[in-house]
Amino acid sequence: MKKILLLATGGTIASRPTAAGGLAPAITSEELLACVPELADLCAIDAVQLFNLDSTNVGPAQWQEIVRSIRENYAAYDGFVIAHGTDTMAYTAAALSYMIQNSAKPVVLTGSQKSIYNRDTDARNNLYRAFVYAVSEGAWGVQLVFDNKVILGTRARKTRTRSFDAFSSIDYPETAVFRDTRLIPFLRRPADLPPVQFYEQLDPAVFVLRLVPGMRADIIPLLAPHYRALVLESFGVGGLPGGEQGEMFAELRRWCDSGRLAVFTTQVPHEGCDLAVYEVGRAVGELPGVLEAHDMTPEAVAVKLMWALGQTQNRAEVMRLFETPVEVDII
């Protein structure tokens, strides 16, 4: 029988109503397991309550805590299941994909849209299936299990705020799906995985700027004292209003000339960006320090930058790390 470690972090799955009328995490890891007694027939389980937070409050410090716990327990367990809130689960899944690379053991995130104590909750289904995937043959790496889907950590996005079908795999096949109680794998553990690598250093000095028509360019210098990298969510396949002659281009050139980075992505959910297509993007793509996110998810773009910036102060090396595919984040 395989041995799995449950890491409980809070979220809706672990929430109870408060006196003020809202929901807040309060249910423990032991209580979660008690709600799914059939897990005892599936595998041996230990549980750790890392923290109990609404996932809106989960960020780099909590990602580091999760990684430390997995690294310290990696040799003792066959896999890991993380109970997590849904709102930032895709960020955590992407972050763990960069901070725990080449893992032959599964690191599975799951949660729910309703508390595990809610009568019509999706929590028990999701938690049980997360463990089913974790003990399955061929399971590996950072995955997100939700509503009968298994999604690679770098490809997961929350696409619905209320429905049980809350997460989608963006521009990449699902790792596996469940049909009733049967797990149907589409992707299996690569045969030539290098040894697992753990990283803990992150630099969160990344700002994401969503362009809107009419936006003033003077916002960019206001960010310079506080951030090393700027992610620009641009229109379509990418570009700047006014192109090479615009005020935004001039400010971005000053940003890059100061040694900072800028990464272009798109506001469109699918198919990525390509600055070479239109004149409003071609000159931008030639600026030193400008990168393209290609088909990466917005969550992966932001946290990969945090990870790369945490490894080095050298801009060229940060650019190399960002452009190197990790866990199929770039196709």
Where do the model's predicted regions map?
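ATP/NTP phosphate-donor binding region
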Residues: M1-E72, R254, H270
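Accessory alpha-helical/coil subdomains and C-terminal extensions
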Residues: K2, L7-G11, T28-S29, A34-L39, ...
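Short acidic, glycine/serine/threonine-rich loops at helix termini
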Residues: R16-A20, A93-A94, R119-D122, L152-K158, ...
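Short acidic, glycine-rich surface-loop motifs adjacent to enzyme active sites
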Residues: Y77-M89, H226-G239
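Short Gly/Thr/Asp-enriched flexible loops that form oxyanion-binding sites at enzyme active sites
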Residues: A83-K105, G242-E251, V280
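Short, acidic/small-residue loops that bind anionic groups at enzyme active sites
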Residues: A95-D122, F131-E137, W255-T266
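Internal gly/pro-rich beta-alpha loop/helix module
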Residues: L109-R179
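C-terminal non-catalytic interaction/assembly regions of soluble proteins
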Residues: V237-I331
